[in-house]
Every structure is written in structure tokens, then in C-alpha cells.
Amino acid sequence: MKCYSRAALAHRLVIAITMVFTAACTDPVSEETLARSREMPQWYEDAKLGIFIHWGPSSVPAFAFGPPLQPGELEEVMFGDSPRKELPYVEWYLNALNYPDTEAARHHAEVYDNAPYTDFKPIYEAHVSEGWDPAAWADFFHSVGAKYVVLVTKHHDGYTLWPSAVTNPNRENWGSPRDMVGELAAAVRARGMRFGTYYSTGLDWTFQMYNDGDRVQDIMRSAPASQEYGDYVFAQMKELIDRYRPDVLWADIGFPSKGRQGELFEYYFAQVPNGTVNDRWGAVDVLGQIASIPGATWAMKALGRLMLSNQSAKLEDDPARPGFKTAEYDSFAGIPPFKWEATRGLGASFGFNARETAADMLTAPELIDFLVDTVAKNGNVLINVGPDSYGRIPVIQQAPLRGLGDWMAVNGEAIYGTRPWIRYNNEHGRAVRYTKTDKALYAIVLGATDQSFTIESPGIPWKSIDVLGAELMQTEEEDGSLTMLLDNPLPGPAIVVRYNL
């Protein structure tokens, strides 16, 4: 009999619960389609860098409170161990208004005199008409080295960024009369990038939103479980597929158990054979119903805390999980045996937060380190921009992205089209991250570097060594270390040593 640690056992219990949730779907994904969803298309494996865009009516108040989530803290918020009263996400502004003790609720009362959230719609749409230029966005994303773009087409507030033919039964005309999804898709693809759509599948606050209990419980219980909502999500997702053929289908907060997920997956892959999906498709509405049972929320929190106590458990795969795994303001402690995508904002929020300053943003070196570390661990980075209500990407967000683009222009071959090596880092000396192709091993040395520097030897035979962006004048190997002399010191923030195999 095999014995498991408490954390590993908890992980297996979570997998079992996930499979139960999947079985609860009225139309579960077939084994064949599930396997197809886990086969990553080569373009996605090679792309490494994507741009996420959160933009909508919440960009008008542009208010959220709190510092960025730390690794693992999102789960702590969900499992009730965080002291936070509200997420630092602008796109959750409407949810924060539900609780009078939040900073967002106080701000809304002071600035907007508690006006209904729907009042932001005409303001947002007028601003978009005045200021948005999708071609300029696409030019900028291409210049920073992005290979794909994922637009939030509907967030939890239910507002759609395209003129949907599927009527919201609870809120008339709750969507853009302008086809912003189509305009951006055309602009992005015209510049050779792929285009994907995010759609809030599990939550839509125009259908239901609770605020009378434990906040974790409220989020779970707010996932609509009705047949009406399942049909609505299916119809809008199918409409997105028909209109835009998204290369990425990005779900969030689960998928309604009555939403015909199996049929949707089969339809998507038939229409977009080279497409891919993420992993957030569990039947969260079933979880919400369980959360309504006395004591059930406590048990789920306890199970989650147990699982989170061991980082190694996160590296284990879940056979019921579709698509690539997502990590939000988080990472892994090693190289997972599955493809994954790290996503976060440049600051604490995904949507534009007018309170944030340049000091709240990732610096260019931090963003480069984030990308390099993720790619070395078999991941892609989907870095978010939050435009203001006029569609302008703030300068403080542009700055780190431009720095990343400059670095990628020199060192992109160590990122694009690479795969993880047998290990992601070195064991001694300077911090290094490894990537590889059939012809080369890349050692990406993190941090500023002098004209002469020393790193640990990878311990493999090679034909020759280069340093990208510089001329290598001299190389000495001694006691498992390599010392290299460049013609000029590179400014950093990371340099790439290429071992030609």
C-alpha cells in the first residue's frame, strides 16, 4: 500500500472532486476531445509571450485597493486565509460594491454618490468612440515581441465587447454596439499575431450575485446553475467561435454544468483545428451548491489549505484537466510535466487602476526575469495591459513592455521556439535559467553583468560558445565553472550564453 503525504493526499482528493464536478456536467467532454485539448499546437508551444487585455465599464471608475497578490495568495483568498477584504482587481469593482466595508464601496459613495454600475456604460462607450485605435494597440504589442493577444470579451459584470445577437435576459443592451472584438482581431492578425478570446464562463453578475454570507461562499454561490444560464453561455461562446475563430478559448471561474461543454469543445476544435483552450472549465456552479450546505465551505477551505502546504503537489498533473494550466500571480517550484501559462498584471490589477503609479509596476528587468523563469519551466507568459476607458495604454504600463521588447530583439532566439532543459536553473553561483533547441542550449544569466563573468558549466559537450549581442573574447573552464570575457560589458538585465551543440 502506497502512503502519501497530507498535501499529496489532498491534491489527489482535489483531483477526485474535480472529476466528480466534471461528471456532474450534463454534457461532459469525451475522453478523445479531452485528450485533443491537452495537445498543444506548435504555434502555442513556440509563442512564449502573449498580451492579455482587461477593458470595459470598470475602466471608468478605475479603482481597486491593495498591493499585488503574492505567489499562492489568490488561493489563500479563495480559501479564507487572507486578511484581504477585496481583491486588488479593478474588474471586480462591482463585486466590491456589494460590501459596504470595502475601500471601493466607500470610494463609490464619495465620488459617484452610489450611482448604479450601469451608469458607466454610456461613459465608457463615448470614451471608446473618442480615443480607441485598435491598429495602434496591435503595432505596440507586435513591437514588444508578443506572438498572441487575448482580449476579455466579457468579464464577470456581463458586459460584452461585441454586439452579441444573444440577448441577455436580465439586462437589455448590456453590451457594446461597436464590434471591438472583431476590430482588434483583424488588427492583431494583420501583424502576424494570433488572437484569442477570454469569456467569463462561470460568473455573470447580471444573472446572480450573493453578498449575505462568507465572501468565499458568496463567490461560489454566485455561479449561476440554471439551464437558462448554461444555454446563454453556450450560445455566446459559439457566437465568438463563429465570428472570430479564436486561436485561444480562455474560460474563467469554471463552466456552467448545463452549458453543453462537450458539444462546445467538439464544435470549437472542428472550427479551429489549430486552437487551444485553458484549464478553467470545472463545474463551479456545482461547487456553489455544495458551498450552500452547512459546514461544506469550511471543509473545502481546509482541503485547499492542506493542498497548498506542499509546493511539490502542484507539479502533479490532473488527468481530468483540459487544455493548458493557468497560474495567476503564481509560478511553480520546478518544471511541470504539462504546458502552463503564467498570467498577471503589470501592477496589482488587471483592469486599469488610476491609483497605481510607476512604482507599482513591474520594472523591465523584473518582467524579463518573469518571462525567462516561466519559459525555463515549460510555461508561456500572458502579461496583462489595462487600458483606460479611452483605450489608451498608460505610459507606466508601456515602459516595462518596451524594455522587454528591446531585450527580446537581441535575445529572442533563447525564448521563442525553445523547450525546457533537464533542469531550469543552475545549482551554484550566478542565477541562470536554461532553455534549449535541437541545435543549442541557452544559459540566460539573470542580473547585471560585468565585462568578465563566471557561471557554472552545464556539464555537457558543446562545439562552440556565443554570447548574444556581444563578441566573446575569451573563455576559460576550470573546476566546473566557465569564465567569459566580452568585448564590452552588456547593460543587462539578463544576458544569454549560447552553447552550440
Describe every region a protein language model picked out.
Residues M1-K2, G351:
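Accessible peptide chain termini
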Residues T22-A24:
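C-terminal motif of bacterial Sec signal peptides marking the signal peptidase cleavage site
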Residues T26-L501:
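Mature catalytic domains of secreted/periplasmic carbohydrate-active enzymes
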